[in-house]
Amino acid sequence: MAADRTAAGTAVRRRQCRGGVRRQRTHVLSSATAGGPHPRNLIGMTVSIPTTPNTRLQGKRCLITAAGAGIGRESALACARAGAHVIATDIDAAALQALAAESDAITTQLLDVTDAAAITALVAAHGPFDVLFNCAGYVHQGSILDCDEPAWRRSFSINVDAMYYTCKAVLPGMLERGRGSIINMSSVASSIKGVPNRFVYGVTKAAVIGLSKAIAADYVAQGVRCNAICPGTIKTPSLGQRVQALGGDEQAVWKSFTDRQPMGRLGDPREIAQLVVYLASDESSFTTGQTHIIDGGWSN
């Protein structure tokens, strides 16, 4: 997951490609490729993820944060393939340019998710939205004794306060039209399953679940749904960066991740993106206030 600060409100030129989203082959995911440099494959499993254009989100406008890489990027592409027009935000201008080149259904904009005024301005310029996917997040590693006050404040600013700002900004437009789907990124780590050295991260992700359930309860009668996604360990660029930052034997770290997974592999961002499309679509119209665990059986 991408996170934290940018020069708010600076637009990135949208690149066009012929025919909307570029057609891609079905992506086949094997346990060896998804789990890092660890060859163990407990069940010989492959996952076929379709990438052909469809109409599941036809006519919907989606706002996605942290769309420059990982889960956010794959979700933006998946929503665009499903017929949505996507406003994709991030703090990385180069990543947004690369994303915009993939689809003419994606408009990109730099955004600091901790800047409430910038979020309000973005929604005023590009809204109203049918779908909000809050993907931005920050992972602090350590126990309560390792978490000083600045780390505590930063974690809440990015992981919780930013969702408060975005939800509050998009809700009036959703309520006015009597429809909307808000999808908030939580985590299995600590909020669902106790995980060592994820103290403040887990606290914030538990708060995301509470935020999501409260919004769902308040606006269910007005046609607005709100759900939380709780992934397990997903092989994203940010996870790779955290592994590198630990130093030491990187292969041993990757092995520790896959060893705790009953499926013998890590998740792929494209698998999470498929859940995002489902929750964004009318297929999930009877689903709200739920925590959707997608962790390969880790928390079972």
From Swiss-Prot:
Write down the EC number: 1.1.1.-
Protein name as it appears in the record: 2-keto-3-deoxy-L-fuconate dehydrogenase
- The reply on keyword Disulfide bond is no
Cross-referenced PANTHER family: DEHYDROGENASE_REDUCTASE SDR FAMILY MEMBER 6, DIHYDROANTICAPSIN 7-DEHYDROGENASE
Known function = Plays a role in the catabolism of L-fucose. Catalyzes the NAD(+)-dependent oxidation of 2-keo-3-deoxy-L-fuconate to 2,4-diketo-3-deoxy-L-fuconate.
Active site residues per record: Y201 (proton acceptor)
The similarity comment for this entry is: Belongs to the short-chain dehydrogenases/reductases (SDR) family.
Q: Which InterPro entries match?
A: NAD(P)-bd_dom_sf (IPR036291), Sc_DH/Rdtase_CS (IPR020904), SDR_fam (IPR002347), SDR_superfamily_enzyme (IPR051122)
Q: Where does substrate bind?
A: R198, R242, R260
Q: Which GO terms describe its molecular function?
A: oxidoreductase activity
Which keywords fit this entry according to its UniProt record? NAD, Oxidoreductase, Phosphoprotein
**Binding-site residues for NAD(+), renumbered to this chain:** 63-90, 112, 205, 234-238
